[in-house]
Amino acid sequence: MQKFYRLSVNIVKILTLLLAVFLFIGSFLTTCYAENMETQQVLLRFDNPLWNLLELAGYGLLFACCLSLSGKAGVKFRRGLLVFTLGLILLLGGMLIVFGRTVPAADALSVYNAAAEWILGNKDIIHPTFSYLSYYPQQIGLMAFLELLLRLWNLTGLSVPAWHFVKLVYVCLLCVAVLFQYRSLRYLWPDDWEPVSCCYLILVCCNLPMILYSSFVYGEIPSFAMLSVGLFLLLKLLADCIPAHSVETTSPDDTRVVGTSHALSAVTVFTALGSILFLTLSVMLRKNSLILIIAVLLVLFFEALRPGRSGRACIGLMAMAVCLTITSVGVLPLVQKCYEKKAGNTLSSGVTAMSYFAMGMQESSRGYGWYNGFNIDTYDAAGMNSDAANAISRAAINERIAYFREHPGYAVNFYLHKHLSQWADGTYASRQATLATYGGRSDFLKEVYEGSLASAYIEWGNAWQNVLYLGMLLFCIATVRKRRPGNGSANAAANDDFRFRNLCLYT
């Protein structure tokens, strides 16, 4: 079992290292961005490596100054930096609400309107053919969350649009995410968490796209917050509640015995349940979070196999994995059933996953593999029949595969540009996501979105992303190069593996 554990962990390390190499090289040598906010076409440019090195050196100097101050002032500096970071998020997030005037648009507007109409008593929101939710039933969880916020806002009796209140809640949730990620660092770097936490807070302060996303009335920010809390509780569970390290105990005859502590207490159970709850909520708010759930399940699997785990702890971790799988897969259907029962109607199965896969192999006006409407057009053409939609999608996939085989150079170019457009955009499409407004946006922010400051914002995001990818790459290299210790250092090796897996999960 230990050999299988080592083999599995090493495979994950190598694959993560390869991913880090691709991400850093792509981001360091190129930048993807959008200039025209109407077409939102993704453009590609090659960067000046010397300029990028200068930006990395600037961040290095910033980190060095931060660590120097941390060494002199100690805990006061770290706490002050945390307060400053959270205050900065609240300040900038509030300014975006007042001066940015972003409004929901596209899918975000459809879900927002669905929640508002439901509150007004419109039961046609739940309908097998006429409803937006019959195309995208996975949005039912976000609709439930927005319904709660809108009902709270309606209690105030104010005439201000409710989406401004939603954005304020999102700013607070962003602070929650940062706070719990900050607290998670103590479990990831128990020996060096103070300097690491300072560097983390510096990165958060410089992460302008994340703050800009607080005005995006969609599922990203609340799901991100739930994930951060759930992962913190998971790390706490693994590190505190069911640790895998040797401890000395005293037997009845006063003989010192080396064993492993695996006490199953109420704290352990509630920590596990809390982690499952928040991770499940993240899926309810944004179905894409299932990707992170898969990563969590892999972590639980590896932790169950970790040397030093007792049979009881192993069973507990596997039971947690089973529970998390059930709740994550079942939460959206459960919410959907609740709404269907209240409405006395049903929703269709929705746009098929295979149509998304087919769309990812096609061109669009924005870029290779981006949204072009194929999924919803196919669902309509199939008469909202999932089997027929899948048949059309399979035919489209086979057609593209045949074309790629006939034109291998085009295939390489297609997937290279698709990869870069998704992973070499340091703004993370934050301007496009928060572009919509009904007027009142300040002149300064207009320049950021479509004017002279847009290029500066793009460059800022690119520099930040280079730092992130470089840090990930260096950590992966250091972890892979570390030699396997002898049997006497098995716990040290397991701790390194624990840190690596969970850092990959956070990344």
State the predicted function of each range:
Residues 166-173, 199-234, 282-292, 507:
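Multi-pass, polyprenyl lipid-linked donor-dependent membrane glycosyltransferases
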